[in-house]
Structures are given as structure tokens and as C-alpha cells.
């Protein structure tokens, strides 16, 4: 279903109107009036559709039509009425004498709507829109457009090339790399202040050396020997007893060589081991004299069954006859009694 066609299209002319057709239509309407647009073409002797005759008369041939461009005042009225009425172009045309609804609609779609959208996109406020701003923008754009036409055409902005993107990326990464050492220096300077370096800004390696020396001065090593351990540095001397502690840390380089950490040194390991061996041998020999088993104990101390670990602080003995004797500390003469064999 739908509206019936005004007339049959077969044998009718289409396209632009000629001056003769405009003259025939104008004379007929002036003498007979508009009347019915369906029967008007046949009565006037035109091979045109009734709709085509109506649009030609209303939009072009009327005497009360305004010719020329739409003024700024008319633009203001159109914007205000459109905000109130919407797309009701016929009602808007009644407030603009000499302008047709078709002309107003075409002007809105082609000019005003685009300018209003651009203005609201820049300002970000669509409610407080002033028509004067739109009109001023139109005048400014027309003047600037005339100036730009006289100048040479500018290069069109397209997508950025990959080479420029790579250069930008390299510049960004380089700036980040330069900023990182500054942050590290600030961190080390703060760490030096927390470590009682009196606010001196030290490098990373100097800061680590200072921390190592501070840790060496605070660490504790339990000495198990009864003799005094005297360092190479004369300022640091530690005398120890049975369960005394010394402020030193051991890192042995080779067996029988002197070990060094910073400025602290200790006596040779071989010397300590020989002293302990002689002391233990004398102790065992004294006990063997009491039990009349001197030969067996002396042979035990001098035999290869006694194992000395160079890297260990404890001495392990494995005796024959399933008798084992281990000591975590040095032997106390008061606690040792007679040893009985199975």
C-alpha cells in the first residue's frame, strides 16, 4: 500500500526546466491560480509531472521569493527555531518570509549543522551556545578562506612515517637511560647519610666498601682457643679465653697462608693446629701415665687415625675398640676423669 502516483510517468519530460516551460506555468497560475497540481499540467499544456510543477513554482517562480544567500539574522532565527521545533521545516519557513522549507532544510544540513557541531566540539558546552558566535565564526572563516586561496596549498598531513616514529622512540629511551644514573646517585647519597657517612655522596663501589667495613666491625666470631689472637693491624687486638668472642671474620685463601679481610689479619692456621696438637698430645700422655697405658695413648695421638680438618674448627678422633670422642669446645682438664676401655 502507499500513495497513488500523481500521474503516469510515461511520455513525460524530466530534467531541467526551460524558459518556455517557466513562462507557460507562470501565466497559467497567474490567470487560474494554483488549483489541483495533478490536473494543472494537462490544463496548462505541459508534459511535466504535477509534483515537478508544484516544486518549480514554490521554490523558483514565485514573486515573493527572496533571492540570494541567507543573512546572519535569518541564521539566528533558524537556529533558535530549530532548537524549539526540531526538523519541522514548514513551520520554520512560516517565520521566514520569502524562504521556502526546502531551502531552509538544505541550508541547515549543508552549513549550519556542521558549524554548530564544530563549535560545540571545541568549546565543550552545547547548552550555552550563542548564535552570534556561530555567525562570527562564519565571517571569520570566509575571510580566512579567501586569504588561503591566494596562498599556495599546504602539504596535506598524513600518517607519520615509520622512520620518524623510530627516531622518536630512540630519543625517549635515551632520555630514560640518562635519567636513571641520576636517580641511582641520589639513592646512594641517601644511603650514605643513613649509614653515618655525614652526608657524603659516594659512588656505588665506595658505598659497598664502607658497608663491608661496617659489617666486619660488628660481626662476631667465637674463638675456641685459649691463646690470644693478635691481628696484623696493631690497632685491633683481641684476647680470648674459653668462650670469648673476637671481632673478625675468616676467609682462608690457602692452607698454611695468612688470611686477610680488609685491614684485619690472623695468625697462620698451621701454627694454631700444631699448638692444639701438642696440647692434646700432652693431655693424653698425662692421662695415660696415670692408667699405666702410656704406649697405647701416645701411639694413638701420633697415629694417622687422628684427622685434622684444615677448614674446620673442631677436632674429631676415632678410636679403636668402638670408642669415639668428639668435642665441640676445648677439653676442660677438670672434667676429664679416668677413661676405661671395653
From Swiss-Prot:
DNA-binding region: 37-61, 89-112
Single biological process term from Gene Ontology: flavonol biosynthetic process
Keywords: DNA-binding, Nucleus, Transcription, Transcription regulation
Outcome of gene disruption: Reduced flavonols levels in leaves. The double mutants myb11 myb111 and myb12 myb111 and triple mutant myb11 myb12 myb111 accumulate less flavonols in roots, leaves, stems, inflorescence, and siliques. The triple mutant myb11 myb12 myb111 is impaired in flavonols biosynthesis and exhibits a reduced UV-B tolerance.
Pfam families, A to Z: Myb_DNA-binding
Known uses: Promotes flavonoid biosynthesis in a light-dependent manner when expressed in tobacco (Nicotiana tabacum) through up-regulation of the biosynthetic genes.
Motif, Nuclear localization signal: chain positions: 154-161
Sequence ranges assigned to domain HTH myb-type in this UniProt record: 9-61, 62-116
Listed InterPro entries: Homeodomain-like_sf, Myb_dom, Myb_TF_plants, SANT/Myb
Composition bias type Basic residues, residue spans: 150-169
SMART domains: SANT
Superkingdom assignment: Eukaryota
Induction: Triggered by HY5 in response to light and UV-B.
Ranges for region Disordered: 140-169
Cited CDD domains: SANT
Main function: Flavonol-specific transcription activator involved in the regulation of several genes of flavonoid biosynthesis. Activates the expression of CHS, CHI, F3H and FLS1. Controls flavonol biosynthesis primarily in cotyledons and leaves. Confers tolerance to UV-B.
UniProt cross-references to PANTHER family, sorted A to Z: TRANSCRIPTION FACTOR MYB111, TRANSCRIPTION FACTOR MYB8-RELATED-RELATED
Protein name, entry field: Transcription factor MYB111
Lineage: Eukaryota, Viridiplantae, Streptophyta, Embryophyta, Tracheophyta
Gene name per UniProt: MYB111
